[in-house]
Curated annotation (Swiss-Prot):
UniProt gene name: flp-21
Biological process terms in GO annotation: feeding behavior; neuropeptide signaling pathway; sleep
Organism field: Caenorhabditis elegans
GO CC annotation terms, alphabetical: extracellular space
Protein name, UniProt field: FMRFamide-like neuropeptide 21
Keywords assigned by UniProt, alphabetized: Secreted, Signal
Length: 66
């Protein structure tokens, strides 16, 4: 349960961060999952960004009047 809460907080931090900070946050999340994940050698975690919109976080477009 604690792991789920921690991962949820980390994921929220990743999604709320600007693009450059997302890469750092994903590296932290990936390192955490590799260190504290299940003991099976066949389980691998990879967290990657889809490099979506680079304009995220700039706010709404301004209104344009005629």
């Amino acid at each position: 349960m604690r792991l789920f809460i921690l991962l949820s907080c980390l994921l929220a931090w990743v999604l709320a961060a600007p693009y450059i900070d997302q890469e750092d946050a994903l590296r932290v999340l990936n390192a955490y999952l590799e260190q504290f994940g299940p003991g099976s050698d066949r389980v691998y975690y990879v967290a990657e960004d889809d490099h979506g919109s680079m304009k995220r976080g700039l706010g709404p477009r301004p209104l344009r009047f005629g």
